[in-house]
Amino acid sequence: MPELPEVETSRKGISPHLINKSVQNVVLRHTQLRWKIPQDLLSDIKDKILLSIDRRAKYLLFNFTSGTLLIHLGMSGSLRICPLNSPPKKHDHADLIFADCLLRYTDPRRFGAILWLGLTPEDSPLLNKLGPEPLNDDFNAKYLYQQATKRKLPVKQFIMDQKVVTGVGNIYATEALFNSGISPIRAAGNISEKRYQILVTEIKEILQQAIKQGGTTLKDFVGSDGKPGYFQQTLQVYGKTGQQCPSCETPLKAVKLAARASVYCPECQS
C-alpha cells in the first residue's frame, strides 16, 4: 500500500505539470473503486483552474477554484503524467485531461478513491478526525507521550492510528521502532517521554529519507514518471523475518498485530 512517502512523491511529481492549468475533460473507464466515482465529476471541475495539490495523511487534495477533489491510491494505485491520447492499459481507470497532458489514475485492485469534497473539504469524515502530520512540529514527544497515557495498545498499533498521527504505515512504523530500540508489542502507555523523543526523531528521519528516495516499491507503486521508489534498498527489518538482525545477528521475529506482520529483533528492541 502506498504510504505517506509514496503519496508525497506522487504529489511532488505531478504538481509542476498541472498547477494553474484547467481541466478540459474527464474520462472514466471504471467508476467502481472503493466508493463510486461521482458521475457529475466533469461538471464540477471542467474548465476550472487547479490552484494547488496538497497532501493530508495518505490523501491527495486537488484544490480547484470550484472546490477540492480527493484522490486516494488505496492498496495498489498510482498517478502518472502522460502525453495526450496515450492509449490506456487494463487498470487505467480515470484520466483528468489538461491542454497539454493528462493525469492517469491506475489501480489494479480498485481499492482507492476519487471523491469530490466541494468547498469545505475539512468537513469530510475522511479528514476531520485525522491526527497531526508526522513531519510537522506539533507531532513531538510531549504530544505522543500525552496521547499514550494509560494506553495498553501495542505501540506499533498506536503510532499507526490515524487519529494519533497520520500517514505512518506498516513499513515505516516497523523501521522506526527498530531504529528506536522499541519492541512493537510494548504497551504504548509503558514508554517514557524520553524514549518517545527517540521514536519521534526516527519517524521523521525515516519518512524524510523515504521521500528523498521516491518512496518504497515492494510490488505495485511507481511514481508519476512510472519509475519505482528505491527506499526498499535501505530497509533493515521490514519483510525480513528469520534473517539476521543487522545490529546483533539475532534471527528476526514476526508478530501479527491488527492483521499485519510486524518484524522486530527480540534482543535489540524492548
From Swiss-Prot:
SUPFAM superfamilies: Glucocorticoid receptor-like (DNA-binding domain), N-terminal domain of MutM-like DNA repair proteins, S13-like H2TH domain. A zinc finger (FPG-type) spans 236-270. The active site is at P2 (schiff-base intermediate with dna), E3 (proton donor), K58 (proton donor), R260 (proton donor). Its cofactor is Zn(2+). Its EC number is 3.2.2.23, 4.2.99.18. PROSITE patterns: FPG_CAT, ZF_FPG_2. InterPro entries: DNA_glyclase/AP_lyase_DNA-bd, Formamido-pyr_DNA_Glyclase, FPG_cat, MutM-like_N-ter, Ribosomal_uS13-like_H2TH, Znf_DNA_glyclase/AP_lyase, Znf_FPG/IleRS. HAMAP family: Fapy_DNA_glycosyl. This is Formamidopyrimidine-DNA glycosylase. It comes from Psychromonas ingrahamii (strain DSM 17664 / CCUG 51855 / 37).
